[in-house]
Design a protein with these regions (language model features):
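Gly/Pro/Ser/Thr-rich low-complexity, intrinsically disordered segments predominantly at protein N-termini
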Residues: 1-203
Length: 203
């Protein structure tokens, strides 16, 4: 998602960041507000190709049986991050344990321990998904992070989180197939060419 940082006016007692974030969500319907590394970011509503790519991505996850008794496939579910006292992210897509609703932390966000995979489809600010969120999700020990980079026509699969990074970072181009780790709960391979084509930004 494309994101812009939000500046805070100077005052003696600034409101908590979660309060600011929730106020912005109320003022900007359809926008995605997150706190990553102690910085509030606001992403505008996605364009059509972004939404198309996300739906196309969901199909193989559902076909693999990942939306069942053991795991669920969910869009825009809040993930509470350990990187800051009020940090959270809202990935475009996630595979979570089926009992995720028993692990609510705060502000409609859930314990990162229930997340088996998170996935982002980039918009204008692709660097956030490939930099800041890499650190955030790795620190949260999310086992698999997938990024569809629409700008460069690539699919990134990051695994083996260690500290603030992932030890394994595979990049796939059209014509290749990306095999995801079975730890997500099923054997699953993504057709990179199809995803790049449906997600291609229209200029």
């Amino acid at each position: 998602m494309s994101a812009a940082a939000v500046e805070h006016p100077c005052d003696d007692e600034p409101e908590p960041m979660l309060v600011t974030a929730n106020r912005l969500m109320g003022q900007l319907p359809g926008h995605r507000v997150e706190i990553i590394g102690g910085v509030i970011t606001v992403a505008p509503p996605p364009d059509g190709p972004h939404a198309n790519a996300l739906t196309t991505l969901m199909i193989p996850f559902l076909a693999a049986g990942l939306h069942g008794d053991e795991t669920r496939v969910l869009q825009a579910i809040g993930l509470w991050l350990p990187g800051g006292p009020e940090d959270y992210a809202i990935p475009d897509l996630a595979v979570v344990d089926a009992d995720f609703d028993e692990h609510l932390v705060e502000n409609n966000c859930y314990d990162p321990a229930v997340f088996r995979l998170v996935l982002e489809v980039t918009s204008g600010n692709y660097k956030s998904d490939l930099r800041h969120k890499v650190s955030a999700y790795a620190e949260a020990k999310v086992p698999v992070y997938v990024v569809l980079d629409r700008r460069h026509g690539r699919l990134h699969v990051l695994t083996e989180p260690t500290g603030c990074t992932y030890d394994s970072h595979e990049v796939y181009a059209p014509g290749q197939s990306a095999e995801l780790p079975p730890s997500i709960g099923a054997d699953l391979t993504l057709d990179v060419a199809e995803l790049v084509e449906v997600g291609r930004p229209r200029t």
